[in-house]
């Protein structure tokens, strides 16, 4: 005797609206908006649970545990909206570029700084320089625009200078004389 999939779930089309995770776990509970009846009295302290029993949700934490998403209430720990403003996104506005500074001035600013401290200098159209405090003094590394992307020294290509700086804050610079340093603190323009 052969059983059909529809017989396994009780109806021929009822299982199509049920997410796979609920079909796979028979102990899971799926709430619909009709099942969830959270209400407060005039005093604001009486709450009704999804099953209609006020004693099941006597604490105010029950309200915070369910989030209304579409037609179903979902546990808030599973789907919490992110605050996009807290995510750090590197952009060109986060880096400082010295406009009128030569190598000698950069070396003077970096001579008593910590290893990995750096500054960026503008060198004209499509070119800049990264001046970095290394173990043997200050190292100057060319940053060039190749027509499509930026490159620092002989390293990989980047879509912006800030993405290159962000990368080298986490990965060592592949530059002779930089002793495989990572970028630490950028000096702000004076």
UniProtKB/Swiss-Prot annotation:
Q: Which residues form the SH2 domain?
A: 96-190
- Which PROSITE patterns does its entry note? SH2
Segments traversing the membrane: none
Keywords assigned: SH2 domain
Q: Which Pfam families does the UniProt record give? A: SH2 (PF00017)
Output the InterPro entries linked to this UniProt entry. Answer: SH2, SH2_dom_sf, SH2_domain_adapters
Q: In which tissues is it expressed?
A: Expressed in PQR, but not AQR, Q neuroblast descendents.
The task this protein performs is described as:
Functions downstream of migratory protein mig-13 and may play a role in the control of Q neuroblast migration during larval development.
According to the record's subunit comment, the protein's assembly and interactions are: Interacts with abl-1.
Name by which UniProt lists this protein = Protein soem-1
Where does this protein come from, organism-wise? Caenorhabditis elegans
